[in-house]
Each structure stands twice: as C-alpha cells, then as structure tokens.
Amino acid sequence: MLQYLKKIKGVSFMKTIKLPVVVTRGIFILPSTSKTIEFGRVKSKNALDASADLYNNQIVVVSQESPLEEEPNLEHLFYLGTVADLSVKKVWKDGTISVELNYNQKIKIDEFVEEDNIIYAIGSVFEDKLPKTDAQKTKIKEALEELQEKHSFNTSELLLVFNENDFNKLNSLIYQIIDKMPLVSLNTKLLLIQSTSILEKLELLKELIINRPKSTIKLNNNLNNNSTVDSEINKKLKDKMDKQQKEYYLREKMRIIKEELDDENSDASQLDKYKKRLEEEPFPESVKEKILSSIKRIETMQPGSAEVNVERNYVDWMMSIPWWEQSEDIDDLKYAQEILEKHHFGLKKVKERIIEYLAVKQKTKSLKGPIITFVGPPGVGKTSLARSIAEALGKKFVKVSLGGVKDESEIRGHRKTYVGSMPGRIIQALKRAKVKNPLFLLDEIDKMASDNRGDPASAMLEVLDPEQNKEFSDHYIEEPYDLSTVMFIATANYIENIPEALYDRMEIINLSSYTEIEKMHIAKDYLTKKILEEDQLTEDELRFTDEAYDEIIKYYTREAGVRQLERHLATIARKFIVKLLNGEITNLVVTREVVVQYLGKHIFEHTSKEEESQVGVVTGLAYTQFGGDILPIEVSTYNGKGNLTLTGKLGEVMKESATIALTYVKANHEKFGISKDKFDDIDIHIHVPEGAVPKDGPSAGITLTTALISALSKQPVSKDFGMTGEITLRGNVLPIGGLREKSISAARSGLKHILIPSKNVKDIEDVPQEVQDVLKITPVSKYEDVYEIIFKNNNQ
C-alpha cells in the first residue's frame, strides 16, 4: 500500500476540498494536460454523474496501486492526484463512459471516503512554486542550456517562454513535454507531481532524456517501484508505450472498430430495406433509377468517406418523400360548415367564400383556380381558419413560415453537392405530411424579401401556379415533383407587400378586426372553454361574468384579434389555481373588481367623446392596426399674420389635408359667414391630441374643415357628432377605408351620429347590426351637406 505525499517539504496547501473520485488503472495524469479516458466501473460512472450534477464538472483523478485489481480497496489508492474538469462526455453502447478531462491542479489527499457507491477524496490542492530571485532564474536557464548543448534536446520553445518571463507557461510546458514522452513510468509521474519547483522538473526531464527508454526514478523512499514494463509488450509496441498504455490503446481501438462495424452493418441493412421497398412499392420509375444509382455508389465507396454520407442522406430523403401516398378527402359541405362554425365565431362572409370554394372543388374534382389568401391583422384567425379547412376536408395540415425568407434556396433547396445541403421548405413540409395531397399553409407570404441570393417570390410562383407546379423542381432531389394535388392557402398582414406576380394568382379574403361584441362571444364560447380544459378546471370552479369580459376587452387589450385577450384570461385562471391549491378559495366568479385585482391597473384607456360641445373641437374617426378609434381635432385662432401651425406628429398626407381644408374655407368664406379680412389678421393652430402618437391618412379632410369653420365662426359643434372623409378643393367628399372599424369605435365612444362619404354606403352592410342600432349613419357627397347638418340643422 502506498500512502504517498503525507508531507511535502516547503509547500503551502490551499483550503481543504471534497470531490468525487475516478480511479484509473496505472494511468497517472499530469497537470496542464488533457486526456480522453474511458470508465466502465460503477463507482467511477457514479462519480462522473455526481461531478456533472453537483460539483460543477470538477473531479479528482487518482491511480490504483495494482492495475489488475478490479475493485481496489481505498487503502490501495495513491494519496496523490490531480483535479480535472469534465468537458466532453459520451456513453457507449456497452455502458462505458468516455470523457475528456482537462487537468489543472494537484491535490494531496488526506482521506478517501465512500458514500452512496461513490468514492470521495478529502484533501488540499497545492501549487508549484515559481522562481522569484534572479539566482533561481539563472539556474533554470542554465538547466535549459545544458539540455540543449549536452543532451541534444531541443529546448528552443522552452527558452522562448523563459525569455518572455512567463514561468506559469514554462511550468505547464514542461508537464506537457514529459506527458508526451513514451514509457514514462508511473513512479516518475508521481515524483513529477510531488515536485514543486521548475528546476526539479527540469532535472527529472534530464534524467528521462539520459536514461531513455528505461527511465524510472525512485520516490524519496516513499514510493515502491511497481511500474515494471513487461519486455514482451515493450517489444510489440516498439518501446513506445507501457503495459497500461497498451491496454487502453487496444480497448479504445476495439471499441472504434466495433462502432465502425456496427455502422456498416446498419447501413447495409438499411440499404437492403430500401431495395426491398423499391421492389414492392409503386415508386415512379425515374425515382427508382436515381435511388438505385445512389445505392450502388454507396456500396462501392470507402465506408466513412464524405461522399458516402452525401449519397446516404440523398437516398434517405428520396425514400421518405411521399411520391404516391394520398389521404382520402371528405366531400361533405355540411360537415365543412359545422367545422367552421364550431371553431370560429362570426366571419360570415369569409365562411361563405370558403364554402363556395369547397363546393367548386367538390364539383370539378380539381384544385385549379386562385389560391385562397387570408389577409388581416395578427390574431384574427387566419391560421386557425386554414386548420379548420384541413379538418373539414380530411386533409393533413402542414405550415411553412415564409417570414424573413430571402434566399431562393429556402424554397427550391440546395444542390446535394454542397456541404449540409437539403431540400427546400416545400419538400421538407411534404415529408412531414407523409402524403402528397395535404393542405399547405404558406404563412406570412407578404414577409418574403429578395436580395443578391435570389428572389424567393419567383420560386413561389412555380409552387403556386397550377400550370407550372405539376413539375416543381427542387435542386436537391433533382426530380420533378407534382404539386397539383396540394391545396395551398396563404396568409398575409398587408396586401400591398404581396409580390405582384403572386397577388395576380390569389383570391383575397379580408379578415377585419373583431368588434368588442364579437370578442366577448369568442371569449365566452371558445377561449374560456379552451383554457378551462387545458387547466383541468370546471365552470363551477371558475366562471367569468359579462362585465369581466368587457373590462378585459376595453381596458387590458388593444388588438384586432384575440391573442392578448386569451393571455389575460389564462393569467386569471393561473392565479386562481394558485389560490385553489393553497386552500384559500374553492371557486371564483370573476367580476370587474376581480379582474382589476388579478391583472392590476388598466393598461389602456379608450378615447371617449367630449363631455361638452365646444368651439373649434370636432371628433374625427380613425382606423388603426388595432381596429378603430375616435380622433378629436382642435383648432384655435389668435392675432397674427395668417400663418398656419400644425402639431400632433402629423404625417405628410394629413398635413396636406389641413392645407386643402384651409384653402377650401378661404375660397368659400362667404358661404360660411366668415369675413375675408379675418384670415389676414389671425394665426391658426391645428392640433391633434396625443402628440407622441404618429397620425396620418387621407380621411380627416371634412373633420379639419368643420373644425376650422367652427373656430373662425365661433359656432360650437355637437359632441355627439363624428365624421370621416377626405375633401377636395371643390368640396367633394371622397371615400375612405375601414368604415366597419370606425363605426364600431364611434359607438363604443358614445357618439350618436356619424357622417360618411356617400360612396361608402355600400360598406354599411359590413357594420354590425348592434352598432347600427345605436348609431345614426348619414352619407354626404359634398361639404355643403356636412355644413348643412352640423351648423344649420343642428343649430335650429
């Protein structure tokens, strides 16, 4: 038994540590080196796991006294070791674990203990002493020069580091040089670790050079020389490794050979399976030829070469693409209607158009025709509508996100000769679908962009055009693929961003934002049920009142869809579950007060109409990405020289509208009872509140005109009126967009009467009936009509 390094002369030890231990068979590792070692014993594997889980990947490596002892006693372990960091860990098929160890510190072990089938070392790490005096440095330099001159040992690298005065690096370099030397005995390595000065290590290096290849150095009478090298093994290994190194080398070699053989056997077996499938299944002849050609190349190539991997991946892809597999469609319009109604509230026109499309498809048995494209803001149900259509038709559903795609190869794939090449997104999605007739959702098709790597929109044209997609060409598979049985549906947020060539082949279905009433129905009939089901709650445990839904919709969300609404409902459900599990409550009825308690203070405040009718203040109607809102416009006059000031972060279009409105009022001042001289004696200030929010658009013309007339004639405008429409210099009122959203916001804000362009009368049918019931909508074609209603009829 060797209890080595109980005392080391002149060494100051650092703090005591406790770390798990792995035991090697006759292999002793030097500091500042790294090695990959394989461990198979249970205690060592347990120690590796403990190191990774509890000790920040630190572990102590020690050697056992006898390499032949399978389970050495703690007394048969050396009391000197190294502390290592685990960096790579791999588990082999036979259960052994291969790890890469980086050795950085030496440790004197005071005691070994065994806990939970893991060996732990309790000891103190210690460091080497670096030279401080000139005399010490001179001796080191002399030793290096002696190695060079007398013993023909190349010390140029050591001298270079010495001249840099980097003694830490010099110390590490000596360890690394000795570690790479063949047949360094275990005893020598132990003595090297015991040594704490660079000069002592250089003396050991000199002994190794002088006595190679038989070098063994005795360890201060404290260490037995048990690292005898078997002569027969020395002969076989040509004096390059000792017994323990040979055993490790052979084990590692056997494992690698076994892995290679297993890989080759599995490849051969897989290729045989592919050949059998080609014989039994109806692959197209041209596809069979390509696959068989690649299989033959694999069989003639050197195993493990890069070309084999390229061909193997190609064969795997070609065999996994659905060349003939199809799902059976459901042709039942009533069932389709039931599915759409089940998953979506409202959207009457959208559902009608979808049913019409499916009816034509069922009648003609063809998918030719425009590609359905859902256009609308985020969260209004574009993707879920596509899923519902897939369910109604019994089709597999696959989705490809095109947002941010700039490279044509994303669509058509890379040629297989490139490193890491693979098919494009279309073929990849078909592989996931496992049938050649899925419903294919092209999400955010308006977000594609072109650059110097090609134009993905042009590639998408080949995908979507029925005249071209019968022979879609993917660069990787190098075989035409028939996409004519695929049903494509696209989604977009903005029509204007869709490439023109694609837009020409699309049937646009607009999904506008939901009204507050629709959101409440969706929350009650869909979202709440979904959340209760996901959280395994019952309606008896958690119930929302209509007032609670209204509170969340108005003051905690500002969106066109219902995603944020769903998140807030889920937040309340989670907070309730916490209280439920803590035993604080057993059920909860969510009211306005509970919403504020669970979600905190209001996030949004909707703009309300003015409390009083005022001079120079008129309510306009705006359309935003979140739906509609009202837009108060203020005009004030004061003594000046006829200047016009615009504030409120207005866009260029809105600034032009203000200029046109002022010009129109000046040109028709007599009709409005305004003195011509007044314009020269005053300055006019137009302001749109919430100055930090950008505002633009062409629909504020009649609102600006009315506010100017009110301010100049000192006539108030009723607080119950709202209006929208652009104006020309001749006083014509031009049509606007977003009438549905604007009408909803007007009713929500408490307005009773709105004026709209007469050319928008056709859009009134899109306004929800519940809004029409509380809001009077009057069309106007010229500004005289507006003036008549606002200033004449209203003041009588």
Curated annotation (Swiss-Prot):
It catalyses: Hydrolysis of proteins in presence of ATP. The keyword Chaperone does not apply. Induction: By heat shock. PANTHER family: ATP DEPENDENT LON PROTEASE FAMILY MEMBER. Residues 612-793 form the Lon proteolytic domain. This is Lon protease. It comes from Mycoplasma mycoides subsp. mycoides SC (strain CCUG 32753 / NCTC 10114 / PG1). ATP binds at G376, P377, P378, G379, V380, G381, K382, T383. It is found in: Cytoplasm. Gene3D superfamilies: 1.10.8.60, 1.20.5.5270, 1.20.58.1480, 3.30.230.10, LON domain-like (2.30.130.40), P-loop containing nucleotide triphosphate hydrolases (3.40.50.300). ATP-dependent serine protease that mediates the selective degradation of mutant and abnormal proteins as well as certain short-lived regulatory proteins. Required for cellular homeostasis and for survival from DNA damage and developmental changes induced by stress. Degrades polypeptides processively to yield small peptide fragments that are 5 to 10 amino acids long. Binds to DNA in a double-stranded, site-specific manner. PROSITE patterns: LON_N, LON_PROTEOLYTIC, LON_SER. It is an enzyme of class 3 (hydrolase). Pfam families: AAA, Lon_C, Lon_lid, LON_substr_bdg. InterPro entries: AAA+_ATPase (IPR003593), ATPase_AAA_core (IPR003959), Lon_bac (IPR027543), Lon_bac/euk-typ (IPR004815), Lon_lid (IPR054594), Lon_proteolytic (IPR008269), Lon_Prtase (IPR027065), Lon_prtase_N (IPR003111). Coiled coil: none annotated. Homohexamer. Organized in a ring with a central cavity. GO terms for biological process: cellular response to heat; protein quality control for misfolded or incompletely synthesized proteins. The keyword Cell division does not apply.
